[in-house]
């Protein structure tokens, strides 16, 4: 099933998707999603964060897990249907605010610069201009020592502009140009995860990160993850 509701801008109609199924990716039940959330949590460098922005919250399952380690979270999504579902899911979590805000739009509701930004399985649904604007937006609004978590399903999702691998490698390069280094890398046959920060030690485990000695090799094709 194709989900483009505007062939000119090629924007997926996620509201229609959620209307057919309130959990179309089985986020609340699938092992892939539960495992991914656990790995995201394990990859966070700090035990607690002051302020977070989840820039594609979906139905709010990851936000619910993050809420145990963040003082205040703004969760946004491009789909009004997803926002409604997430609002219900997170109703008993008073330090979480859910709002409609599509990338690369600057979100309202950020009381302070977030020290954690999460962009999970969103980038490949944006066109090239919107992806570039998203990288610039994150660089602009994140706190100086913020952590940015990027997660992409590795293959090419239906109705996506690029594959997860392509989006991840593009984002890594764009962030590096802005002074963000990768401090955590996870790559397997299902998804890619990276934690990026401008607060990167010059020497990590004997590697000179300041001079580009990066031992964290990411696959350049899906076959490399097998």
Predicted regions and their residues:
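Class I (Rossmann-like) S-adenosyl-L-methionine-dependent methyltransferase catalytic domain
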Residues: 1-55, 59-110, 126-140, 146-226
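A conserved beta-strand element that flanks and buttresses the S-adenosyl-L-methionine
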Residues: 118
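Hydrophobic adenine-recognition pocket in adenosine-nucleotide-binding enzymes
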Residues: 122
């Amino acid at each position: 099933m194709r989900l483009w509701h505007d062939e000119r801008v090629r924007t997926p109609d996620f509201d229609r998707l959620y209307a057919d199924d309130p959990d179309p990716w089985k986020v609340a039940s699938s092992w892939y999603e539960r495992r991914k959330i656990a790995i995201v949590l394990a990859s966070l460098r700090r035990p607690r964060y002051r302020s977070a922005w989840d820039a594609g919250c979906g139905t709010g399952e990851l936000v619910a897990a993050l809420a145990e380690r963040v003082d205040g979270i703004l969760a946004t999504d491009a789909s009004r249907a997803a926002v409604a579902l997430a609002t219900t899911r997170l109703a008993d979590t008073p330090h979480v605010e859910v709002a409609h805000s599509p990338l690369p739009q600057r979100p309202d509701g950020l009381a302070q610069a977030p020290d954690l930004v999460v962009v999970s399985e969103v980038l490949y649904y944006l066109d090239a201009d919107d992806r570039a604007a998203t990288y610039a937006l994150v660089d602009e609004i994140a706190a100086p020592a913020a952590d940015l978590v990027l997660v992409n399903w590795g293959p090419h999702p239906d109705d996506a502009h690029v594959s997860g691998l392509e989006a991840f490698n593009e984002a890594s390069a764009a962030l590096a140009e802005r002074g963000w280094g990768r401090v955590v890398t996870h790559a397997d046959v299902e998804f890619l995860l990276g934690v990026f920060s401008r607060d990167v030690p010059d020497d990590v485990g004997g590697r000179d990160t300041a001079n580009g000695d990066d031992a964290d090799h990411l696959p350049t094709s899906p076959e490399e993850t097998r």
